[in-house]
Amino acid sequence: MPVSWFLLSLALGRNPVVVSLERLMEPQDTARCSLGLSCHLWDGDVLCLPGSLQSAPGPVLVPTRLQTELVLRCPQKTDCALCVRVVVHLAVHGHWAEPEEAGKSDSELQESRNASLQAQVVLSFQAYPIARCALLEVQVPADLVQPGQSVGSAVFDCFEASLGAEVQIWSYTKPRYQKELNLTQQLPDCRGLEVRDSIQSCWVLPWLNVSTDGDNVLLTLDVSEEQDFSFLLYLRPVPDALKSLWYKNLTGPQNITLNHTDLVPCLCIQVWSLEPDSERVEFCPFREDPGAHRNLWHIARLRVLSPGVWQLDAPCCLPGKVTLCWQAPDQSPCQPLVPPVPQKNATVNEPQDFQLVAGHPNLCVQVSTWEKVQLQACLWADSLGPFKDDMLLVEMKTGLNNTSVCALEPSGCTPLPSMASTRAARLGEELLQDFRSHQCMQLWNDDNMGSLWACPMDKYIHRRWVLVWLACLLLAAALFFFLLLKKDRRKAARGSRTALLLHSADGAGYERLVGALASALSQMPLRVAVDLWSRRELSAHGALAWFHHQRRRILQEGGVVILLFSPAAVAQCQQWLQLQTVEPGPHDALAAWLSCVLPDFLQGRATGRYVGVYFDGLLHPDSVPSPFRVAPLFSLPSQLPAFLDALQGGCSTSAGRPADRVERVTQALRSALDSCTSSSEAPGCCEEWDLGPCTTLE
């Protein structure tokens, strides 16, 4: 059909193939018959009244087949109308009846059989809003009257119709001896026919081509400049429904770009001129496009509206099947329950359900096309909770009073009982016993197809795994005794104290020396917190809040606060004690931690909680302010062993080689101290010192 060629040309992005039509110059209707027949067309139309069926008195002439052909009726060369030519094929039906009246001579019978046959053939034509009926008288000579044989055809010119209209044609005789013939045809529009210069309504019709431009689809509207027309982009989910997406009046020519992800099979286009009574071009060029079908499945959604009720949302009809399936807890593919449960055709945008199905969390629905699952949703997942480890038994009717039972597994439906090595086969007798004693839940039943039963597997799982649980208990007991044997080591590990190292910001070289001390202490083992390792938290919360939080936490855990005194720290402490204004540098947090710890010293709460240290050669012990001397004061690295004992609270160091470890710490501190003092606090002091990985105390 021309319409098919039109859509094919759109898909290829080329000009469509068009059909040239025969032209009729006569404005009146005419009729003609094939050789041997005579025809006469009644003037004007007749009433379209088929009447009731009657019995044929003998051989009668009846229509047997209808054909149509499109032509142009052209009173003027450029003023034509689309017209439907109808060809009616005729045949003789029935036989001569034997005479019932006595006394008829053979000559009279022969005379009646040598007479010609006549018939009145009615052609009924409907194409909204047009409805017409034409009457043809057809005569067949006696020599052509052969019952059961075709005698020829009659041609009627013609019924006028609109471009793109759907026409219906009926044919019958008066009186009517058989059921009327009928024919329905969709006429092409201006695009599919060579009529642009012949039919005035097609003169200003926009032409449209579809092509691909990368990830986009380009709609090219070939319209003369300054020509106004309307463009409508819409969805047609069902034949009689239309959902408009975009409508606009445009001036040609135009290029309209669509994203390829927006294409779906029911996306259609209408274009028409703004001239009065202009024809509309309507087509859906993406119906057979594979990409449009893929997009449709990506857009489609399967929603559970309520327990057991779902809805498939999609902009177009989906060519799929909806199947009830069983989802096992192991996340294996959902197994369709067809048979015995019949599947449904996919219906979009309407609530659906499987009737007579009882609720179970493992029952789901899936939408499939050509054995491929596209969408799936579990109907009772929200109302009945997670999947259950139940075994689904399928009871099938095998005879009038006979049934068979099989267990649905990933490998298929295992007959019960069975010698297979599957889980259901091993428990076959027990499952059958549960089934016969009505311990299983019936999910679905059909007197002709069968039933579905869900059998709980909890008791079989408990019995099977009892030895495993005993083994786990024995393993747990063994692990418990092993941990008891390691009790001393764990206590030693828990006995390692936490320490907060507080210092002043005396320059980059001094900060590297502080970092070396913190790294060395963290290997003793001690859990060390220092602001150098927590710059991000310090910046986020503020120095005062960070120091206060760390001090309170460490003291609650029984830890110790280490005060590292330097000349700058001593000077600021003196200013604090003399109630002088302290203006710290941009990176100096000394004022913050002084406000946290000084009340403990002034109120006598420092003993056992604080330790003071300073580096050899950098400070004289008498320089430390007197309020801070109530806490032990050590010089590093010369008094390192005593300092470590004070940090451990009198406990011995951890197992291993403590003397070697103390010696390594001493050497590390002395090397860092020598490096910083030799550089005279020059920028870049101690850059070669690797602080190593450090543990921040949260």
Curated annotation (Swiss-Prot):
The chain crosses the membrane at residues 465-485. Residues 496-645 form the SEFIR domain. One of its GO terms (biological process) is interleukin-17A-mediated signaling pathway. The keyword Coiled coil does not apply. Highly expressed in colonic epithelial cells. Expressed in lung epithelial cells. Expressed in macrophages. Highly expressed in B-1a B cells and at a lower extent in B-1b and B-2 B cells (at protein level). It comes from the Eukaryota. Glycans are attached at residues 182, 209, 249, 255, 259. Receptor for IL17A and IL17F, major effector cytokines of innate and adaptive immune system involved in antimicrobial host defense and maintenance of tissue integrity. Receptor for IL17A and IL17F homodimers as part of a heterodimeric complex with IL17RA. Receptor for the heterodimer formed by IL17A and IL17B as part of a heterodimeric complex with IL17RA. Has also been shown to be the cognate receptor for IL17F and to bind IL17A with high affinity without the need for IL17RA. Upon binding of IL17F homodimer triggers downstream activation of TRAF6 and NF-kappa-B signaling pathway. This is Interleukin-17 receptor C. The lineage of its organism: Eukaryota, Metazoa, Chordata, Craniata, Vertebrata. The gene is Il17rc.
